[in-house]
Amino acid sequence: MVCTSTSSNFYSIAQYILQSYFKVNVDSLNSLKLVDLIVDQTYPDSLTLRKLNEGATGQPYDYFNTVSRDADISKCPIFALTIFFVIRWSHPNPPISIENFTTVPLLDSNFISLNSNPLLYIQNQNPNSNSSVKVSRSQTFEPSKELIDLVFPWLSYLKQDMLLIDRTNYKLYSLCELFEFMGRVAIQDLRYLSQHPLLLPNIVTFISKFIPELFQNEEFKGIGSIKNSNNNALNNVTGIETQFLNPSTEEVSQKVDSYFMELSKKLTTENIRLSQEITQLKADMNSVGNVCNQILLLQRQLLSGNQAIGSKSENIVSSTGGGILILDKNSINSNVLSNLVQSIDPNHSKPNGQAQTHQRGPKGQSHAQVQSTNSPALAPINMFPSLSNSIQPMLGTLAPQPQDIVQKRKLPLPGSIASAATGSPFSPSPVGESPYSKRFKLDDKPTPSQTALDSLLTKSISSPRLPLSTLANTAVTESFRSPQQFQHSPDFVVGGSSSSTTENNSKKVNEDSPSSSSKLAERPRLPNNDSTTSMPESPTEVAGDDVDREKPPESSKSEPNDNSPESKDPEKNGKNSNPLGTDADKPVPISNIHNSTEAANSSGTVTKTAPSFPQSSSKFEIINKKDTKAGPNEAIKYKLSRENKTIWDLYAEWYIGLNGKSSIKKLIENYGWRRWKVSEDSHFFPTRRIIMDYIETECDRGIKLGRFTNPQQPREDIRKILVGDLEKFRINNGLTLNSLSLYFRNLTKNNKEICIFENFKNWNVRSMTEEEKLKYCKRRHNTPS
């Protein structure tokens, strides 16, 4: 390279820009490398200077400053630095290669001036050297890669070596991106100066001698042809309008026919797509309806079977002289509970039998004071949604009734029933000691499909299973099994039902209970607020053996749950619901609800405080504050669409824009790579970018290898053809957008070329093997060692 006075002046100008705009100390100029200058990803048309720290320091780099292009080309630091790049590295000696690119200095030490140069003491009048607005010169003309290759002829070879040898090298990629940016800025600014001869004519003359092939290029000189083409396009539009105004021409009818044919094709395609979606929706609805019908039929059969079992048990007990509690028409048969409960520890049943034996008279007859603890209690009303609609109004308006109206009969004592039925003088062994006693069938954790079905089946009867919350609140023993053999009547205590116990039972249970009050409480429902949480917080399930040892958290005693449905909508709780501000979370005694004399005469009520699961409201407030926080870039924020299913959807969002919003390409051009993205979904952006980058790569490959031979064909049409090919590749191989992006990323990670075509002659889309899909399209999860 021949160093002239003009080029040496630009060396001094480059040193001034680095010191004045990029805030570099004169002592640090020697240590700066070419890879320390990169294209900024935040501000458009900007450069960032930061020095990489190769040692084991705490910071990966030392940041200097970011500088943007100026609208006034005579004061633009990027333009001056670009001219320096053209002079210094248009034909570098030695050439920049993949072996030495990290050692190339940004400024040659021979040209760094350390003496008192008056130029270096000129103060920068614009301290804010970065801008978020693109200059008009970068928007009026976009140079092609061929023009950039005229400025830096060696750049294409370096990029090819990068793709073949070391495509994952970030420094090498940043260097190629830097010279592409410098070439684009040089072409745009020199073209602007050539159109305005009074601006910096000496620089244009000097660069035209330095790279004459650029100024001889037709595309570079195409401003007049662009104007002529615009005028011709305007004349053509005017001619078409005049032809439409004249109804006698045949061309009008032909054009109208062609327009209507194109419109009919689009409508036909859209109608086919809609009909397919409607057919699929109908099939899905039919399958859901079949599932619902099967569930309803199964529930009816289950309910009818339980009623038949209950009627048989009533007849058997009445034939032996005993009796059970007769319920009104709105209640559930008590024998349904025989399929829902489990016997408790036989150690709990023995004292009950002994206590009842002491209460018997000397003649073996049971007195009227015998409590009804041995009768099975009712299952909770909320376990049967279809029956709760008729029972709940009754509970709200239930009034105290006289003793003679409530029909009830005493259960016979176990000893008398057993002796009367079997005639044996020996009492039968208790069933609770059998190792084959029945057990609860716990509810499975709800799945999204079950939740959707539950919302459709609002009036259906739930499966006769005790949920985990009911199990935690219940101490249960098993009842008699057959009409021929009667055992000691067990104790049934179910959350949500009323039952009276003997003094021994109540004293024994109250010792294990963590609560001091003797009230039976239903478990409060957890809130589900869709505005703050996407999924409700599920409480930690407790094993059956540890339920009695669990104590309610202190936060549930001190802080009421403001998010509970009872506090939000008092009308749903009936007429007797507590108003706001009362202890709505405290257990409500069943005796207060039913007003029955049996509950009033009982010496104690079995107490199990339902464990509450408080949810911190601060968690929801943080989420709301996070969603409503408005930053300085809130006006330009764009949330990536979640409705993209095909490559065409990605193409429309990237290049056209959805719902009248700006396209992603436009957002990148205006605001850079980061500022417009919503932080919550910014991690989805690389999966889309790798697909769109591959489409651009295939466009370039198709042009170079002769697939697209028409030079007048717009790149937009070429891009659409490649989008169609990629969509065909995705459909033929049964890939989703995520699996396709994962396929591209895994190939890139393994330094393998991405290609969807069988060959470059007929350009047919290839088919993937199952081994390829398993290797590249499946996510890998680290297995625990």
From Swiss-Prot:
GO biological process: negative regulation of transcription by RNA polymerase II; nucleosome organization; positive regulation of ribosomal protein gene transcription by RNA polymerase II; positive regulation of transcription by RNA polymerase II; positive regulation of transcription from a mobile element promoter; regulation of glycolytic process
Localization annotation: Nucleus
Record keyword DNA-binding present: yes
Modified residues (Phosphoserine): S449, S482, S489, S538
Predominant location: nucleus
Disordered: annotated span: 342-381, 416-451, 481-620
Post-translational modification: Phosphorylated in a GCR2-dependent manner.
Stored InterPro entries: HOT1, TF_GCR1-like
GO molecular function terms listed in the Swiss-Prot or TrEMBL record: DNA-binding transcription activator activity, RNA polymerase II-specific; DNA-binding transcription factor activity, RNA polymerase II-specific; RNA polymerase II cis-regulatory region sequence-specific DNA binding
Location of region: Leucine-zipper: 267-299
Region (DNA-binding): 632-785
Oligomeric form and interacting partners: Homodimer via the leucine-zipper domain. Forms a complex with a GCR2 homodimer. Interacts with RAP1.
Record-given protein name: Glycolytic genes transcriptional activator GCR1
Organism: Saccharomyces cerevisiae (strain ATCC 204508 / S288c) (Baker's yeast)
